[in-house]
């Protein structure tokens, strides 16, 4: 790490050949290797042993560059998919390590620019803003007063060259970009990195960091348009908007303002909208406004044209849906969110006369969708497609305590994440499925009936399915059912959830 600090001084950040020499430094790959082991992203999960040689990595990179200049095939023929060795070494392991090293090296210019930008400036630093649940209080405060929302699926680039062309405006090191381009094009299992799921894409577990970096950079370039819009609209010049925007952007977006102003000045009037709010998670984004349907249609066509003209991405208009918040539920971050009218009758009395006043207010609701959740449980073999609990034969070889702990942890994860649901009835059903599935798994293991096993186990099975809040009410107020009921009518957002991992992959 000390050697890295010596080499990464700000004075060299402007040199064109800054990144290229770092590709041959062994400590870069040692850093990537150690970070990967700590995060359990590769090597351990991929089934490789922990034997690793920095010298082999350096030889492979030298071999790569030699083949690149000779215009020969780099590793092996694309048609020869069964070959597993590079110069006698493990293909998957060392190719993966080269990608991880590239990820560390390419991130360096962005990190240095970030330090330079933040120097002498105060920025709100809060770990709570990393939580997925931090989005929902924002939606509660803003979306209840809006009319329409654009449900956007950000298109995935279908060609590697789009990644490289976008990256070249940031990384001025031509040698490194040529090496990166050659490696990506010659790597024979590029398609295995992208797993197509219906209308979206996701990354496989191998080389996640590097391709997440490329994809997130690409998405941030998409979002550069919103900096331009904020600077052009007086109503969007708010500290809160700027703070949240800077959390999801690279700071070069500010430099794009002049380009957008020059090319889109004629249609700038479309965006003079004081109530404009944008949130994104992964490839899904929501853009809400208080404007009319006509305004949202203009937004839709503008975004599609912007993607096609500046990023050469063919985006089908059906990937952007226009929905009215008052009669549509948003499927976002695992919740079904909607805006509904809440009617309140107030009795008013003046001297001898009394009358009723009806007040209507909008309220932002979040519910747990039961059908997709039962589908996930069915896929994991906890129940059938109708939601009837089943035993888990794969866990029958475990000890009783491990089986109960696994089922209980899955429920606690679900309960923790869906604590923001206004109605907990669906969560009760999930709890019932997991508890009965746990009981049937234990009964199957001991060759007994569910009734007999539950009678023998007693409350021991139930305790693992209590959340921390439920345990407090159960131990202190066991008879206060009304007080306990208040717990299930509350909506709680936790600010420690940084990823969605309901099922706790034990397979």
From Swiss-Prot:
Molecular-function GO terms, alphabetical: RNA binding
Gene Ontology process terms (BP): mRNA processing; RNA splicing; tRNA processing
Protein localization: Plastid, Chloroplast
HAMAP family from the UniProt entry: MatK
Family membership noted in the UniProt record: Belongs to the intron maturase 2 family. MatK subfamily.
PANTHER family in the record: MATURASE K
The protein's name: Maturase K
Gene label: matK
